[in-house]
Amino acid sequence: MIGLLLLFKRDMILGFHRTAKIFIIIVILGLFNFLYYLYFLHISLSKSNVAFWDIIGKTFTGVPFELVEQQTIEFPFGWIIFQLSGAILVNTFIKEDLFAHSAFIRVRTKSIFKLWVSKLLFCCTAILIFYILILSLTCFVWKLSGGTVNNLTDYGESILRYSSFQFSYSQIIVYSILLNIAGTFLFTFIFALLSLIFKTIYSFIVCICILFLSIFSDNPMLLGNAFMLIRHPMFGLSPVVSITMTLIIVPFLCIILLIVGGIYLSKYDLISNTEIE
C-alpha cells in the first residue's frame, strides 16, 4: 500500500506537470460552454430569474431520443467534450510514462500492476478536480450575475419536457452531475486500456464513435445512453433505480478494465518491445 501511495504521489506531480496546458484548455472550454448559456439566458430571458440547472442542464441532460427521431437534434458538443475530458486530459501520458520509465520503476516496485493502478487513480483525481473547478466557477459567476433562483424554472422544465418522470430540483442537479462524472470515469478507463494496445488516436476515435452512436440510438449497449439523464430509465421502471444501477455498474466496469489492463501489462514485454507515440 505504501508503494502504491508513493507511485500515486509521483503520478500526481508528474501528471499535472505534463497535462497542465491541456487541463487549462479543457477548463476554459467547459467554462465557455456553461457561461455561454448564462449569457444567453440573461439576454433572452431578461425578465426571468436564472437557475443553476438552466446553465448546466442543456449540457448534462443529454439529447432526448424524440428529437433524434424528429431529426431536429441540436448536436451535444458540450456533452461529448465533458464525457471525453478525461481522455483528452490524459492523452498519451499513461502510455508514454509506462513505456519510457517502466523498466526502472518496475524493478523498484516489483509490480507493474501498482504502476497501472496509480495512473488510473491520477485520472480519477484529475477528473474530480476538473468537475469541481468547472462547477464551482460556474456557480460563482452565476451568483455574481444576479437574478438567480434555486428552483426549477420554466426554461429548466423545457429542458426535461420529453421525460416521463419527476425529480426535485436538487435531485435533477445531483443526478445529472453524478451521471456525467461516472461517464467521464468510464470512458477515460476505456481510453486508457485501449491506448495500451493501440495507438492513442485510434483509442480516442473508438470512444468518440461510441458516444456518437449513442446520440442517434437508444440501444442500452451503447454506453453513452447511460450517462444522459433524459434517457433514463434504462434498466428499470424507476428512474432512481435506473440511475443507482448505472452508478453501481460503472465502478464494476472500471474495476474490470483496471484488471484487464494490469493483466495485459504483466504479460507484455515492456522493456524490449515498446513504442512511444
Language-model features, listed with the residues they occupy:
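Transmembrane alpha-helices and adjacent helix-loop boundaries
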Residues: E96-H101, I127-Y131, I201
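Interfacial "coupling" helices/loops that link adjacent transmembrane helices in transporter permeases
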Residues: S102-K119
